[in-house]
Amino acid sequence: MDEQSQGMQGPPVTQFQPQKALRPDMGYNTLANFRIEKKIGRGQFSEVYRASCLLDGVPVALKKVQIFDLMDAKARADCIKEIDLLKQLNHPNVIKYYASFIEDNELNIVLELADAGDLSRMIKHFKKQKRLIPERTVWKYFVQLCSALDHMHSRRVMHRDIKPANVFITATGVVKLGDLGLGRFFSSKTTAAHSLVGTPYYMSPERIHENGYNFKSDIWSLGCLLYEMAALQSPFYGDKMNLYSLCKKIEQCDYPPLPSDHYSEELRQLVNICINPDPEKRPDIAYVYDVAKRMHACTAST
């Protein structure tokens, strides 16, 4: 459910202005208590609006999902159960899930507003300037991302959709990992219809073989993201590439090496062990986080 916020900064939305009486007893659990201001993003299955709570003035992101059209009853129940899990996460580098409720035949999810750019925008900026991201900057952001994922995995929650567009960076340089992958709850028929939207460069070999997603699949995506921060493109990116040739490249771990004259052996080695076709041979998040902390400490002073 990636959110494409670029080009979505439209005029203020008026048709969603609450007309119902305020319900202080309901808190964040009803649309009546929100003023919706403008659309800020759109995903395959959802639209995201900037809104503010009329009870406390807090700005939020309100994600509206067409839940009844896109899910069967079991998937709806599983999705809501998963969101309840996400609400238990509490970490400075994870977008906070405040509330979720079904109203007007839609699933409404109230999230912390990430009023910031994202990592994909930062990568595009460096690419446009024909400059590589300094290694100390890579570790500054990557260590925060590892901290977020360590928190999630310690609570047995997988992200499932780690990629630069889902990593937000605030004006003060704080990383916020957002848009946790709830897409698996949508019907296979619906998902198939959307499978050509965006090339799945971060898809792990086990996903290709439909062997299911596990915690080590998040590590694969994390390795791809670290590579992309250094190379300014996905490890498996190729011009005019179809899905078949992409899957072949992923299965064979066929990607160009990072420049050794610009990035440390430690960074290149970490990428290599994360992007391993065998999930069992990939490290866990605790190991990746330890390396990131050590490298952040020794590059921050340079």
Curated annotation (Swiss-Prot):
ATP binds at residues 40-48, 63. Residues 34-299 form the Protein kinase domain. Binding to NEK9 stimulates its activity by releasing the autoinhibitory function of Tyr-97. Disruption phenotype: Mutant mice are viable but are born at sub-Mendelian ratios. They further suffer from severe growth retardation, infertility, abnormal gait and slight paralysis of the limbs. In an experimental autoimmune encephalitis (EAE) model, mutant mice exhibited reduced disease severity relative to wild-type mice, as well as reduced recruitment of lymphocytes, monocytes/microglia, and NK cells to the spinal cord. Pfam families: Pkinase. Phosphorylation at Ser-195 required for its activation. Residues 20-33 are annotated as: NTE motif. The modification Phosphoserine is found at residues 5, 195. The record marks 97 as: Autoinhibitory. Signal peptide: none annotated. One of its GO terms (cellular component) is nucleoplasm. PROSITE patterns: PROTEIN_KINASE_ATP (PS00107), PROTEIN_KINASE_DOM (PS50011), PROTEIN_KINASE_ST (PS00108). It catalyses: L-seryl-[protein] + ATP = O-phospho-L-seryl-[protein] + ADP + H(+); L-threonyl-[protein] + ATP = O-phospho-L-threonyl-[protein] + ADP + H(+). Keywords: Acetylation, ATP-binding, Cytoplasm, Cytoskeleton, Kinase, Magnesium, Metal-binding, Nucleotide-binding, Nucleus, Phosphoprotein, Serine/threonine-protein kinase, Transferase. Protein kinase which plays an important role in mitotic cell cycle progression. Required for microtubule nucleation activity of the centrosome, robust mitotic spindle formation and cytokinesis. Phosphorylates EML4 at 'Ser-146', promoting its dissociation from microtubules during mitosis which is required for efficient chromosome congression. Phosphorylates RPS6KB1. Acts as an essential activator of the NLRP3 inflammasome assembly independently of its kinase activity. PANTHER family: MITOGEN-ACTIVATED PROTEIN KINASE KINASE KINASE 20-RELATED, SERINE_THREONINE-PROTEIN KINASE NEK7. Displays an autoinhibited conformation: Tyr-97 side chain points into the active site, interacts with the activation loop, and blocks the alphaC helix. The autoinhibitory conformation is released upon binding with NEK9. Monomer. Interacts with NEK9; interaction takes place during mitosis; it relieves NEK7 autoinhibition and prevents interaction with NLRP3. Interacts with ANKS3; this interaction alters the subcellular distribution of NEK7 by preventing its nuclear translocation. Interacts (via N-terminus) with NLRP3 (via LRR repeat domain); the interaction is required for the formation of the complex NLRP3:PYCARD, oligomerization of PYCARD and activation of CASP1. This is Serine/threonine-protein kinase Nek7. It comes from Mus musculus (Mouse).
